[in-house]
Amino acid sequence: MGCTRDAILDALENLTADELKKFKMKLLSVPLREGYGRIPRGTLLPLDAVDLTDKLVSYYLEAYGAELTALVLRDMGMQEVAEQLQETMSKGPRNVLAEVRDPLQKTAKPGLHFVDQHRAALIARVTVVDGVLDALYGKVLTEEQYQAVRAERTSSDKMRKLFSFSPAWNMTCKDLLLQALRDTQPYLVDDLEQS
C-alpha cells in the first residue's frame, strides 16, 4: 500500500507554503477517531511535506492518514485536491478509504484476532510489558506511543494504554503483538488459546 503514502505526499506537495501551514494548523484541531493520538504541535509545525507524510502514516497508518488528509483539505476548501487524493485511493488495488469507513466489517466476522478476542485477559494477566514493547517499537509503535505506554505505572495500565492504540492497527500489527506475547509470555498465550 505504498501508493497510499505517495498519494498523500502528492496532495501535500501541491500545497503552497501558506496552505501547508494552514493544513498543519487545521490538523491540530480536527476531531480524531477514538484511539488515535494527536501529533504534538512542536513536532508538527516544522515539518515539510515529505516529513509530514511520514508522520501522518506513522501516527494514523496509511488508510486513516489518507482519510484524515482528505478531511482537512476539504475543511480548507480545497475540494479538488481532496477529490484527487480520494480518486487515487479508489484506483488502488483495493479501496483503502472504503476499508477505513467500515472497519467493523472485519471485526464482525466470527474469527476475531487473538489479541481482540482475549483483550481483557491480556490486560489483566500480562506481567512483563517491556519485552512486548521492545518487540513492537519501530514496527507497530512510534517513539511517542512507546514512551506513553512505558510511562504507565502498572502492567495492566501499560497493557490498557497499548490497546488504546490498537484501533489504528491492521492484522500485521496484531500478528506482531501476538508474536511478541508468544516470545515473552508463552504459557499465558497457550492457556488463552486453549480456553
Swiss-Prot record:
Give the CARD domain ranges: 107-195
Q: Which InterPro entries match?
A: CARD (IPR001315), CARD8/ASC/NALP1_CARD (IPR033516), DAPIN (IPR004020), DEATH-like_dom_sf (IPR011029), NLRP_Inflammasome (IPR051249)
Query: Which cellular component terms (GO) are annotated to the entry?
Result: AIM2 inflammasome complex; cytoplasm; endoplasmic reticulum; mitochondrion; NLRP3 inflammasome complex; NLRP6 inflammasome complex; nucleus
Which SUPFAM superfamilies does the annotation name?
DEATH domain
Classification via SMART domains: PYRIN
> Where in or outside the cell is it found?
Cytoplasm; Inflammasome; Endoplasmic reticulum; Mitochondrion
Post-translational modification note: Phosphorylated.
What coarse category fits the chief subcellular location reported for this protein? cytoplasm
The organism's superkingdom is given as Eukaryota
Q: Which UniProt keywords apply?
A: Apoptosis, Cytoplasm, Endoplasmic reticulum, Immunity, Inflammasome, Inflammatory response, Innate immunity, Isopeptide bond, Mitochondrion, Nucleus, Phosphoprotein, Tumor suppressor, Ubl conjugation
Per its UniProt record, what Pfam families does this chain match?
Answer: CARD, PYRIN
Q: Which residues carry this modification: Phosphoserine?
A: S195
Q: Glycyl lysine isopeptide (Lys-Gly) (interchain with G-Cter in ubiquitin) crosslink - at what positions?
A: K55, K174
List the GO molecular function terms. Answer: cysteine-type endopeptidase activator activity; pattern recognition receptor activity; protein dimerization activity; protein homodimerization activity; Pyrin domain binding
GO biological process annotations for this chain's record?
A: activation of innate immune response; inflammatory response; innate immune response; intrinsic apoptotic signaling pathway; macropinocytosis; myeloid dendritic cell activation involved in immune response; negative regulation of cytokine production involved in inflammatory response; positive regulation of actin filament polymerization
Residue span(s) of domain Pyrin: 1-91
How would you summarize the oligomeric state and partners of this protein?
Self-associates; enforced oligomerization induces apoptosis, NF-kappa-B regulation and interleukin-1 beta secretion. Homooligomers can form disk-like particles of approximately 12 nm diameter and approximately 1 nm height. Component of several inflammasomes containing one pattern recognition receptor/sensor, such as NLRP1, NLRP2, NLRP3, NLRP6, NLRC4, AIM2, MEFV or NOD2, and probably NLRC4 or NLRP12. Major component of the ASC pyroptosome, a 1-2 um supramolecular assembly (one per macrophage cell) which consists of oligomerized PYCARD dimers and CASP1.
What biological function has been recorded for the protein in this entry? Functions as a key mediator in apoptosis and inflammation. Promotes caspase-mediated apoptosis involving predominantly caspase-8 and also caspase-9 in a probable cell type-specific manner. Involved in activation of the mitochondrial apoptotic pathway, promotes caspase-8-dependent proteolytic maturation of BID independently of FADD in certain cell types and also mediates mitochondrial translocation of BAX and activates BAX-dependent apoptosis coupled to activation of caspase-9, -2 and -3.
Domain comment quoted from the record: The CARD domain mediates interaction with CASP1 and NLRC4.
Q: What is this protein called?
A: Apoptosis-associated speck-like protein containing a CARD
Q: Which organism is it from?
A: Bos taurus
Phylogenetic classification of the source organism? Eukaryota, Metazoa, Chordata, Craniata, Vertebrata
